[in-house]
């Protein structure tokens, strides 16, 4: 088979918030393996993509804005206390991130690539990958990491964790 038509091995890297996905990604990057960070691309869409921002305003209202930008603490509070709102934002973002990943993948020339995403299964993209790596950490450790990293309260972090797929469900897939 010609080198041009060979697809890289697509590896999904997942785990709950604060599990250590970014640390593992850095190891892969240090080995020269390209990493697509889904969370970074989602945030970029919410900060820079006017079309996405308009969709968010339409779904969540003008009150979600602060100084012409999305008020992320307010958005987080809304989506992690209302499962319907969480589904709404995922319905907006997941297809856009999937398209960005597809475009990025076409440009890769390595034998392996990593797609880092806390929501591989929720976004229905896990089945498009060849292998999955699940990064795990004790819940208490995860909570402490996120409190320090994101300046969130324990209650906020627990709400996020409770809205993510359980590790047991990933292992049983």
Name these PLM-found stretches.
Residues 11-13:
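Hydrophobic anchor at the beta1->P-loop junction of P-loop NTPases
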Residues 100-101, 109, 127-128, 139, ...:
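Small-molecule kinase domains that catalyze NTP-dependent phosphoryl transfer to phosphate-bearing small molecules
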Residues 16, 28:
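P-loop (Walker A) phosphate-binding loop of NTP-binding proteins
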Residues 40-109:
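ATP-dependent small-molecule kinase phosphotransfer cores
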Residues 99-107, 112-145:
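ATP-dependent NMP and nucleoside kinases share a basic, alpha-helical "lid"
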Residues 1-9:
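Extreme N-terminal, non-catalytic leader segments
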Residues 19:
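ATP-binding Walker
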Residues 22:
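Walker A/P-loop
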């Amino acid at each position: 088979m010609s080198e041009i038509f060979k697809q890289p091995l697509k590896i999904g890297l997942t785990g709950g918030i604060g599990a250590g996905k970014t640390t593992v990604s850095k190891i892969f990057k240090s080995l020269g393996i390209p990493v697509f960070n889904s969370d970074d691309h989602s945030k970029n869409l919410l900060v820079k993509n006017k079309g996405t921002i308009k969709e968010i305003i339409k779904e969540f209202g003008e009150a979600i804005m602060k100084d012409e930008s999305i008020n992320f603490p307010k958005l987080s509070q809304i989506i992690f206390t209302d499962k319907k709102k969480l589904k709404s934002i995922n319905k907006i973002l997941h297809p856009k991130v999937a398209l960005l990943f597809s475009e990025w993948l076409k440009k890769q020339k390595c034998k392996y690539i990593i797609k880092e995403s806390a929501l591989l299964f929720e976004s229905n993209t896990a089945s498009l990958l060849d292998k999955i790596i699940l990064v795990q950490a004790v819940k208490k450790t995860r909570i402490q990491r996120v409190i320090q990293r994101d300046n969130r309260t324990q209650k906020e972090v627990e709400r996020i964790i409770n809205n993510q797929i359980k590790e047991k469900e990933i292992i049983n897939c």
